[in-house]
């Protein structure tokens, strides 16, 4: 195996697939563009779903990238040797071009000949088949053809070797996963990569999207067969360098060294200190990327902002355990900005914002943390049972800013449980008028591709342009959510709009609607789009060519669509509400055609 740095591994991977005819594309934002079902980009394939479904990608049908991702389902697991909330995914795709044989040959060649993994320790898994879809004998035969012996090819069920669909229906298919045998003894005669005994460590997988799952549960062959390869950068570095923990890699070492200096503690002096430093290093890396993202997430009590707040406050709590001085979190973020700025330049561009938001949130929570911890100690000392009531948990949240997950974590550390349902009931009762609402959370993007949502999508472009004309350039989009009934649009602005400003924005939009202006879509290079003054998230678009939607001389944005044919289709535009979304972000709700 090659001992590599993170920079070397990124370069080797992208250069390899570039040599195989793949276009290198940029990482997308951590906030999905048009997917209202999730908070974050959680996998390399996430931004490419439209192209996996058949839409032509501007860069072609062979792509490769390093996609930044956030997964927060296991926040409480962070602190062990392997879990991270932020990670980079090395990925490559074939969009209706090559399929299993060439994909497998590339994976084998890259892993064994370029990264120099031991051929004698290499093992793979393939789909064993079930009543819905046949056994993936094709992949098994191609692995044999590459020289993998039959006793190191394992057939496993859907729970191990199948991807998708993302929803009830959609593209899906078998995958083949690649492993290295660590040399540990078998846990049983049936020991395989499906075990969690640690004998086998995954180093990559290829997903073969060849089926479409229908609403009735049946599967049909896809017209366009796709390949999606994924290899986690952090995990791969850990394995290649023989580390026991991802926190030993060069992605975390500088931050942990800084935490040691700031706290006066050594990383390996105790399990408690090691865990605390891992949590702080992970959570501040993720927070740095979320705040620095082109969509600029800030701590709040809803959606992405809530996750960000939860990460920062968890880091503050564990910082107290290791005597981390106040305002240390922003210093750790500055270390990450310096470390990543050559790869993700926007972190340096947004450095001031990152430092400001981290300092603000750390100071805000530090002021109540100690009081809250004292109150928690009183609670567990005096309650007669081992369950903290929902009302008490809500009081800790409402008075001291303890996210429910923090209260649960503290409770479990002390042998208590929390009545989470009771907390949720108390929260709903208190938050009936919460801007997030009780029934629908704001995740951003389009709810569907109906004619009405297409019109409302066009309305968001008109609104975006009108806001910047009335309020200035700071009023850039921070997020959007569109259903068939209304649009919701978040934008950067540090105060409530006046009645005159709201009317001015409405008048500007309605003026464009009355003009019945055609909505024109063109494909062009990113440089051409920039030269024409198009609004876009230039650090996070794919390939050399992009779609640009133009509405006369009023609006020009890089966008994936869909849109109305002309502005007259909207009939009219009305702002129904203007309110705060979070610190420095305002939210508008609006309707059309009424």
Where are these regions (language model features)?
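A glycine- and charged-residue-rich anion-binding loop/surface
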Residues: 1-594
């Amino acid at each position: 195996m090659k001992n590599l740095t993170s920079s070397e591994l990124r370069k080797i991977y992208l250069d390899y697939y570039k040599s195989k005819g793949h276009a290198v594309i940029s990482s997308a934002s951590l906030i999905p563009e048009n997917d209202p079902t999730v908070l974050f980009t959680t996998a390399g394939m996430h931004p490419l779903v439209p192209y996996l479904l058949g839409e032509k990608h501007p860069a072609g049908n062979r792509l490769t990238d390093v996609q930044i991702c956030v997964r927060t389902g296991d926040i409480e697991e962070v602190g062990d040797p392997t879990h991270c909330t932020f990670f980079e995914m090395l990925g490559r795709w074939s969009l209706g071009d090559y399929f299993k044989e060439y994909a497998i040959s590339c994976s084998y060649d890259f892993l064994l000949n370029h990264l120099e993994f031991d051929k004698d320790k290499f093992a793979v898994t393939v789909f064993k088949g079930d009543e819905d879809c046949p056994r993936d004998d094709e992949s098994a035969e191609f692995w044999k053809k590459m020289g993998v012996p039959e006793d190191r090819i394992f057939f496993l069920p859907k729970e191990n070797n199948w991807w998708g669909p993302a929803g009830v229906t959609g593209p899906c298919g078998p995958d083949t996963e690649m492993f290295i045998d660590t040399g540990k003894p078998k846990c049983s005669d049936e020991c395989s990569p499906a075990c969690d005994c640690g004998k086998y460590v995954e180093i990559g997988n290829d997903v073969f999207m060849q089926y479409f799952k229908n609403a009735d549960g049946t599967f049909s062959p896809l017209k366009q067969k796709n390949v999606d390869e994924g290899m986690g950068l952090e995990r791969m570095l850990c394995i290649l360098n023989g580390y026991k923990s991802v926190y030993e890699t060069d992605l975390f070492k500088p931050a942990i060294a800084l935490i040691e200096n700031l706290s006066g503690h050594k990383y390996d002096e105790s399990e408690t200190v090691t865990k605390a430093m891992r949590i702080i290093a992970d959570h501040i890396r993720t927070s740095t990327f979320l705040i620095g993202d082109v969509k600029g997430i800030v701590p709040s009590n809803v959606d992405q902002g809530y996750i960000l707040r939860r990460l920062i406050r968890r880091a503050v709590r564990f910082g107290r355990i290791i005597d981390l001085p106040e305002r240390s979190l922003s210093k750790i973020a500055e270390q990450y900005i310096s470390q990543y700025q050559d790869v993700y330049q926007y972190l340096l561009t947004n450095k001031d914002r990152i430092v400001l938001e981290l300092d603000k949130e750390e100071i805000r929570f530090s002021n109540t943390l100690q009081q809250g911890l004292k109150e928690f100690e009183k609670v567990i000392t005096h309650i007669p049972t081992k369950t903290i009531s929902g009302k008490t948990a809500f009081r800790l949240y409402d008075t001291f800013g303890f996210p429910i997950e923090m209260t649960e974590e503290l409770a479990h550390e002390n042998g208590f449980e929390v009545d989470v349902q009771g907390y949720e009931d108390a929260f709903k009762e208190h938050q009936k008028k919460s801007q997030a609402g009780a029934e629908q959370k704001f995740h951003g993007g389009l709810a569907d591709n109906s004619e009405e949502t297409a019109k409302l999508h066009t309305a968001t472009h008109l609104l975006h342009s009108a806001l910047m004309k009335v309020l200035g350039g700071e009023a850039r989009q921070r997020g959007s959510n569109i259903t068939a009934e209304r649009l919701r649009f978040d934008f950067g602005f540090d105060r409530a709009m006046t009645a005159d400003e709201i009317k001015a924005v409405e008048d500007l939009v309605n003026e464009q609607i009355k003009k019945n202006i055609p909505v024109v879509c063109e494909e062009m290079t990113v440089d051409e789009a920039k030269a024409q003054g198009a609004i876009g998230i230039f650090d996070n678009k794919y390939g050399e060519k992009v779609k640009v939607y133009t509405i006369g001389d009023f609006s020009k944005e890089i966008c994936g669509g869909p849109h109305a044919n002309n502005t007259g289709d909207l009939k009219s535009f009305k702002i129904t509400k203007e309110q705060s979304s979070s610190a420095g972000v305002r939210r508008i709700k609006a309707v059309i055609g009424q």
